[in-house]
């Protein structure tokens, strides 16, 4: 691991210094040597892209994305050995810290889920349906001016938006209900580890589904009606 590599690095640098070499030169020489050695396994592409996930998998690296599962690595035998050998933490201390990590993760997702439910039902859906009503009124006005067939042709875009808004708001409503139920189920789990896993696999996943629908509505509803900050506006908030 990284810790072992750092320990080995210090050991080699100390050996060079003991042999009479200047400290700075010893560090630079060892670094130069290590850079040459690791060149074949370095990845110079975008580490946030799917390309890296594929490449990392080929190299046998862990590509796990679930935080609660990743926390488990602290309790791997090699991890415990590293922490204990360096006098940082004992196995018991690592176990205690992991309990806190799992509990903290759960509480953060829990709070975010509650806020998302509130924003969805009390802000996003009312805003979207208000804009939908404006579109309906526009379509009705067009029908009062033109023959029905021509009016519907001229209002084709608005009719599509009216339908899309209805479908997306219904999906959000169902999603929020499912989100609440997922939280209720997860909250009954006593183990902090298992509860965190449940929050990641069910609650956080449902939040992503709801967010997708809200993001789509954000692109549909006109700016003056959308009271929440849009993504592009967040760039200019001080």
Which residues does each predicted region cover?
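An acidic, glycine-/histidine-flanked metal-binding catalytic module
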Residues: 1-24
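C-terminal amphipathic alpha-helical interaction region
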Residues: 33-238
């Amino acid at each position: 691991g990284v810790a072992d590599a750092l320990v080995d690095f210090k050991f080699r640098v100390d050996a060079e210094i003991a042999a009479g070499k200047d400290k700075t030169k010893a560090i630079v020489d060892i670094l130069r040597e290590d850079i040459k050695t690791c060149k074949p396994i370095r990845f110079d592409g975008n580490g946030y892209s799917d390309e890296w996930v594929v490449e990392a998998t080929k190299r046998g690296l862990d590509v796990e994305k679930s935080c609660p599962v990743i926390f488990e690595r602290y309790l791997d035998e090699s991890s415990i050995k590293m922490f204990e050998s360096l006098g940082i933490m004992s196995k018991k201390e690592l176990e205690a810290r992991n309990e806190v990590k799992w509990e903290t993760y759960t509480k953060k997702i829990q709070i975010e889920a509650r806020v998302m439910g509130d924003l969805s039902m009390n802000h996003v859906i009312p805003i979207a349906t208000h804009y939908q009503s404006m579109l309906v009124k526009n379509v009705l006005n067009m029908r009062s001016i033109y023959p029905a067939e021509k009016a519907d042709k001229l209002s084709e875009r608005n009719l599509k938006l009216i339908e899309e808004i209805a479908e997306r708001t219904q999906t959000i409503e169902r999603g929020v209900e499912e989100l609440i139920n997922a939280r209720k189920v997860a909250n009954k789990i006593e183990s902090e580890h298992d509860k965190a896993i449940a929050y990641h696999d069910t609650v956080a996943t449902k939040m992503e589904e709801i967010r997708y629908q809200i993001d789509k509505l954000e692109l549909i509803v006109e700016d003056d009606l959308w009271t929440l900050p849009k993504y592009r506006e967040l760039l200019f908030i001080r």
